[in-house]
Amino acid sequence: MADGVDHIDIYADVGEEFNQEAEYGGHDQIDLYDDVISPSANNGDAPEDRDYMDSLPPSVGDDVGKGAAPNVVYTYTGKRIALYIGNLTWWTTDEDLTEAVHSLGVNDILEIKFFENRANGQSKGFALVGVGSEASSKKLMDLLPKRELHGQNPVVTPCNKQFLSQFEMQSRKTTQSGQMSGEGKAGPPGGSSRAAFPPSNRGRGRFPGAIPGGDRFPGPAGPGGPPHRSQLDKLPTRPPLGPPGPPGPPGPPPPGQVLPPPLAGPPNRGDRPPPPVLFPGQPFGQPPLGPLPPGPPPPVPGYGPPPGPPPPQQGPPPPPGPFPPRPPGPLGPPLTLAPPPHLPGPPPGAPPPAPHVNPAFFPPPANSGIPTSDSRGPPPTDPYGRPPPYDRGDYGPPGREMDAARTPLSEAEFEEIMNRNRAISSSAISRAVSDASAGDYGSAIETLVTAISLIKQSKVSADDRCKVLISSLQDCLHGIESKSYGSGSRRERSRERDHSRSREKSRRHKSRSRDRHDDYYRERSRERERHRDRDRDRDRERDREREYRHR
């Protein structure tokens, strides 16, 4: 029961007491859960997934304490049932999924783990959800597919390798189809499903709520339908974004409330709406959401921070333009070109992402004022900050053996290896000759080939004396091979006349072709000699003519 005691310590942070002998007596459920979850942990989706078995329940409790998620009533009784929930959009968060599950009357959620792409940390569209009772799992499998989540009906399946591979294949097909179509992945809707939650710095691919500007993904509609902004006006910290054209100035914030400044730029002026700008997910060629009003441009990923706030303008504002001015920073394509689709997530200076988002794909908040490098340039040596490769021991690449072979040998070691190679060579030649004289040419050839490979693999194979041994073995091998071919044809001739005649014809043909080949080369050499003789005669004639002229 040592394992059970360990699991009691692990789940102590959940805050629920349960009887160890009565309800947690066997290891079948834990072993089965480990076997089911181990492929997803080794799937290489995210580095933090490898040890999430030990940290899942504490992290769930911490998330409930930190964020503003709905109240979760844990009725954990020592039983855990894992389900896969798929057919989700890539911007679906754990809050969205929790709200959908709670709407069905299921309140014993133990964990929610999203599967993510290793390349960009983006959700693959399915998650692992653990509940604490069989009734909750049945209710999820029966009722959740009938609910609509971001315009799509979720798919609930048991947790096994078959459904995991199906969801993986579906996510790969979706990614490949999005890349081949050239449109990029559609942005999330305008925030109707997220307006019910306060801006809590959680979610997948969302910008922090402190940055003004309404929806930061003004892209085309995804599978969930066109974006709608029905509840954006409920957020007091964001002025509404008007239709294309010069919008009117919004009202000031309520008394006693201060607009928090954005993390990577100057604070927004309260007398004008935020300027529109193209963001990831907006297709190429789509006009901006409106003309640029005067004021500092918002930060754009990959172009550095904007230049500081402008001085107070006493006169008329400058004419609005369709594009924001380019801030100082590394040059790149025009701002109308959307960045590559593999760069989702918060901009530089955003708060840390949600627990199911890999934090290695986002820069720390401390570097919010430092211009980031251009995302379209060559990547650094290790863009994701992975540790150096660990030592694999006996299964490492052969480079270590080559390095060991390059190390200088002492005279005693050299002589020992050389004597061993000489013994191998002499014994192999004597055995091969005896086998060949007995007619066992296959064994003789195999002996010589093995001896040659052993000597070539030794540490002194580059030495001239070792090369002499190898050449002597190869000469012996060629002689035995030629002898074996001739004896084989004689044996065939003595056994079957038809085969011997065909072999004889082929040998005659080979001998004729060899003779023709030799004759051809002889004729070529004769031609060369003739040409040389002609050249010599010409040179002599020229020398004679020169001597005659000089006289």
Swiss-Prot record:
Residues 237-265, 285-366, 377-388 have a biased composition (Pro residues). Keywords: Cytoplasm, mRNA processing, Nucleus, Phosphoprotein. PROSITE patterns: RRM. The keyword Nuclease does not apply. Residues 504-514 have a biased composition (Basic residues). Its main location: nucleus. The modification Phosphoserine is found at S494, S500, S511, S513, S525. Residues 81-161 form the RRM domain. GO terms for cellular component: cytoplasm; interchromatin granule; mRNA cleavage and polyadenylation specificity factor complex; mRNA cleavage factor complex; nuclear speck; nucleoplasm; nucleus; paraspeckles. The modification Phosphothreonine is found at T157. The keyword Transferase does not apply. Residues 169-410, 477-551 are annotated as: Disordered. It is found in: Nucleus; Nucleus, Nucleoplasm; Nucleus speckle; Cytoplasm. It holds the Pfam family RRM_1. Residues 389-404, 489-503, 515-551 have a biased composition (Basic and acidic residues). One of its GO terms (molecular function) is mRNA binding. GO terms for biological process: co-transcriptional mRNA 3'-end processing, cleavage and polyadenylation pathway; mRNA alternative polyadenylation; positive regulation of RNA export from nucleus; protein heterotetramerization. Residues 169-180 have a biased composition (Polar residues). Component of the cleavage factor Im (CFIm) complex. Belongs to the RRM CPSF6/7 family. Component of the cleavage factor Im (CFIm) complex that functions as an activator of the pre-mRNA 3'-end cleavage and polyadenylation processing required for the maturation of pre-mRNA into functional mRNAs. CFIm contributes to the recruitment of multiprotein complexes on specific sequences on the pre-mRNA 3'-end, so called cleavage and polyadenylation signals (pA signals). Most pre-mRNAs contain multiple pA signals, resulting in alternative cleavage and polyadenylation (APA) producing mRNAs with variable 3'-end formation. This is Cleavage and polyadenylation specificity factor subunit 6. It comes from Gallus gallus.
